Swiss-Prot record:
Biological process, per Gene Ontology: 'de novo' IMP biosynthetic process
Domain MGS-like residue range list: 1-147
Protein name: Bifunctional purine biosynthesis protein PurH
Reaction equation(s) it catalyzes: (6R)-10-formyltetrahydrofolate + 5-amino-1-(5-phospho-beta-D-ribosyl)imidazole-4-carboxamide = 5-formamido-1-(5-phospho-D-ribosyl)imidazole-4-carboxamide + (6S)-5,6,7,8-tetrahydrofolate; IMP + H2O = 5-formamido-1-(5-phospho-D-ribosyl)imidazole-4-carboxamide
Entries under NCBIfam families matching the protein: PRK00881.1, purH
Domains as described in the record: The IMP cyclohydrolase activity resides in the N-terminal region.
EC number: 2.1.2.3, 3.5.4.10
Organism encoding this protein: Neisseria meningitidis serogroup C (strain 053442)
Classification via InterPro entries: AICAR_Tfase_dup_dom_sf, Cytidine_deaminase-like, MGS-like_dom, MGS-like_dom_sf, PurH-like
Coiled-coil stretches noted in the UniProt entry, renumbered to this chain: none
Keyword vocabulary terms for this entry: Hydrolase, Multifunctional enzyme, Purine biosynthesis, Transferase
Amino acid sequence: MSVIKRALISLSDKAGAVEFAQTLTKLGVEILSTGGTAKLLADAGVPVIEVADYTGFPEMLDGRVKTLHPKIHGGILGRRDLGEHVAKMEEHGIGNIDLVCVNLYPFAATIAKPNCTLEDAIENIDIGGPTMVRSAAKNWKHVAIVTDTADFPAIAAELEANNGALSDKTRFNLSRKAFSHTAQYDGMISNYLTSLSDDVLSGEPQIGEFPSQFNQSWIKVQDMRYGENPHQRAAFYRDVYPAAGSLSAYKQLQGKELSYNNIADADAAWEAVKSFDAPACVIVKHANPCGVAVAADTLTAYKLAYATDTTSAFGGIIAFNREVDGETVKQITDNQFMEVLMAPKFTAEALEIAAAKKNVRVLEVPLEAGANRFELKRVGGGLLVQTPDIHRISRADLKVVSKRQPTEQEWNDLLFVWNVAKYVKSNAIVFGKGGQTYGIGAGQMSRVDSTRIAARKAQDAGLDLNGACAASDAFFPFRDGVDVIAEQGIKAIIHPAGSMRDQEVFDAADEHGIAMVVTDVRHFRH
């Protein structure tokens, strides 16, 4: 391990920079810096040499040229173990730079601004920063590169423990992280520029949704014991810039390690439960809701959701969109086995009760509004990319196509079952009343079969469908689904319409005295 004697610090994100530089100074490290970073360190009393003074060449072109100088890059790239390199560096007065601390212009924050122009974006494309990062990362055997200010405390501790030196392992890991950092940065720039319309030269270009070259970066959270099945290998990655309220922000409070299927099902449950404004409970099995309810409190919501399908709920994922108390957890543990319990927060009593079931995974997930910008699905040799299905409707968006108008209670129930249907695998049929699902038919190849399954689920649960409402995620291709629904005593249906036989379906509703409303929005889910 070679001792660090000279460092270059040039940061956009300056969190922890002063404290880190103070540690370097105590270890006798000479510090070079630029612009705002140099001023920050100098104002804090840290001895610092401006890069312009070090190179003898001023910053120029509005700061575009600061560190692009042989004295900087020679000091970073020069190999200390090659006599020819050492001789050339001595000949040209180039000193070693042993540590580089650089992060890049905030391109992501810039293009996220609603009024960002192409000129704004271009001016926030870092040139000197990535060049230094890549130079240092390439020469990792002799130079350490830090691109993440969150690493400062660990690096400082290692330097202090080793009299100013870093291990080969640390330098190599920092190098890998640095190359990932620049790859992600360049990918982001590529996504932005290739999303622009072709009228760049004729005015301000418009940004399209989908870039012509799609780049994404992911950070590994954990290796998994296995994938969807034991013979498959798997790992879990999170987005570099995850949407607010995403599952990837979870904090596991207890229980066994999450499995591949746990995470997939937990995501389905979380996306569904956070779509409700009222206190809600969603129970998921194999990525499908098997019980959903909204109520005045979490205990009541759970009881109603569980009552939909007590058999399928066994071994399920249970999600809430409110803080969960001890009474609710006790009811759950008395009723059933579960794999995952998740909510924005748990009371101390709730956690104490859950602890008795030590294998149950308990997750806290921040309840924040947000959605992934894109949904991704791999196909052979390709990738399907779409915007997420976050469409929400209100009563004003709906059109009544039947002779009978829905009652006030039916309007509320129709909106509830429609929202649930959005999270059920197609073909999806959902029956419900009073903020509780009464039967869910999922994933069937024919819509009428899903309808029959939903009816059977309600019958098995002992739930009376008279006066309930029904939702279909897509249009009814024939009237048979409406006829089956009518046989159950259901009095209101919500669906998108759009079939060649819509009028036949509307007429069937009138024959049965059913109120029918259409959304003009489909919610296929595959």
